[in-house]
Amino acid sequence: MMKLMLFSIIVILFSLIGSIHGADVPGNYPLDSSDDTYLCAPLGENPSCIQICRKHGVKYGYCYAFQCWCEYLEDKNVKI
């Protein structure tokens, strides 16, 4: 019983540490000249999304929810 309690406490502590130091990377969905997002497939790392994100001035992006997502894309650079 004591081992289970200790294990539970350790799991909770690691969960809290992970949520405090989470790796949420800011970003935005880039927009084309018609204010539409760029559609994409397959999900995940996607060469066309990376290319689109580079046009918007950031180094990396990927396909998320069938739309290109650019990491570190600021609001002012969303539309080209």
Swiss-Prot record:
Cellular component aspect of the GO annotation: extracellular region
Positions in coiled-coil regions: none
InterPro entries: LCN-type_CS_alpha_beta_dom, Scorpion_toxin-like_sf, Scorpion_toxinL/defensin
Domain of life of the organism encoding this protein: Eukaryota
Expressing tissues: Expressed by the venom gland.
Main subcellular location of this protein, as a coarse class: secreted
Record key words, sorted: Disulfide bond, Ion channel impairing toxin, Neurotoxin, Potassium channel impairing toxin, Secreted, Signal, Toxin, Voltage-gated potassium channel impairing toxin
Keyword Signal (UniProt): yes
Disulfide bond positions: C40-C63, C49-C68, C53-C70
Keyword set includes tRNA-binding: no
Protein role: Weakly inhibits the vertebrate potassium channel Kv1.1/KCNA1.
Domain comment quoted from the record: Has the structural arrangement of an alpha-helix connected to antiparallel beta-sheets by disulfide bonds (CS-alpha/beta).
Other remarks in the entry: Negative results: does not inhibit the vertebrate potassium channel Kv1.3/KCNA3. This toxin is a weak beta toxin because it has no effect on Nav1.2a/SCN2A voltage-dependent sodium channels when perfused at a concentration of 100 nM, but when added to the extracellular bath solution at a concentration of 1 uM it shifts the voltage of activation toward more negative potentials. Has no effect on the Nav1.5/SCN5A voltage-dependent sodium channel. Administration to mice produces no toxic effects.
Family named by the database record: Belongs to the long (3 C-C) scorpion toxin superfamily. Sodium/Potassium channel inhibitor family.
Protein name, as recorded: Beta-toxin KAaH2
Organism: Androctonus australis (Sahara scorpion)
